[in-house]
Curated annotation (Swiss-Prot):
GO terms for cellular component: extracellular region. This is U4-ctenitoxin-Co1a. Disulfide bonds join 2-19, 9-25, 18-39, 27-37. It comes from Ctenus ornatus. It is found in: Secreted. The keyword Secreted applies.
C-alpha cells in the first residue's frame, strides 16, 4: 500500500512509497535526527 501525500513516512527510507511518482519523504531534522517525516512531492 502506498502512503498518501501529506501522510507520515519512514525517514530512514529514501523512498517513502508515496502514491505519486515524484514522491519522497521530507523530514524536519538536525544533527542526523529526523522527525515529522511526511510524504512530499518533488518538482521533477
Amino acid at each position: 500500500s502506498c502512503i498518501k501525500h501529506g501522510d507520515f513516512c519512514d525517514g530512514d527510507k529514501d523512498d517513502c512509497q508515496c502514491c505519486r511518482d515524484n514522491g519522497f519523504c521530507s523530514c524536519s531534522g538536525i544533527f542526523g535526527l529526523k522527525w515529522n517525516c511526511r510524504c512530499d512531492v518533488g518538482t521533477t
